[in-house]
């Protein structure tokens, strides 16, 4: 964890950031971390959460739905509504 804690959050992939965030959550839930360390890893967890949210927003923006005309020919793209 020490090596991960020194890695710049902005350089982490979504999967790596999520993995580290899950580790932090487990450590905090165990309740065996000293107070000062708890605060430090909580702050890192917040940064990791923001990183994951940013990467998800970027991925959603890249997912496009192809639009077609009456004959079925592609006319362009529009944001994909997944709901």
From Swiss-Prot:
Indicate the enzyme's highest-level EC class.
Answer: hydrolase
* GO biological process terms, semicolon-separated: DNA catabolic process
- EC id: 3.1.11.6
| GO MF annotations, alphabetized | exodeoxyribonuclease VII activity
Record localization: Cytoplasm
Q: Name one GO cellular component term.
A: exodeoxyribonuclease VII complex
SUPFAM superfamilies in alphabetical order: XseB-like
Keywords recorded for this protein, A-Z: Cytoplasm, Exonuclease, Hydrolase, Nuclease
Query: How is this protein organized at the quaternary level?
Result: Heterooligomer composed of large and small subunits.
UniProt function note: Bidirectionally degrades single-stranded DNA into large acid-insoluble oligonucleotides, which are then degraded further into small acid-soluble oligonucleotides.
User: What protein am I looking at?
Assistant: Exodeoxyribonuclease 7 small subunit
Which organism does this record belong to?
Rhodopseudomonas palustris (strain TIE-1)
């Amino acid at each position: 964890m020490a090596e991960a804690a020194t890695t710049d959050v902005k350089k982490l992939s979504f999967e790596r950031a999520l993995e580290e965030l899950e580790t932090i959550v487990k450590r905090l839930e165990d309740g065996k971390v000293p107070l000062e360390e708890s605060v430090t890893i909580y702050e890192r967890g917040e940064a990791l959460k923001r990183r994951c949210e940013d990467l998800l927003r970027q991925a959603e923006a890249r997912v496009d739905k192809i639009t077609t005309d009456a004959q079925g020919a592609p006319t362009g793209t529009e944001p994909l509504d997944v709901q």
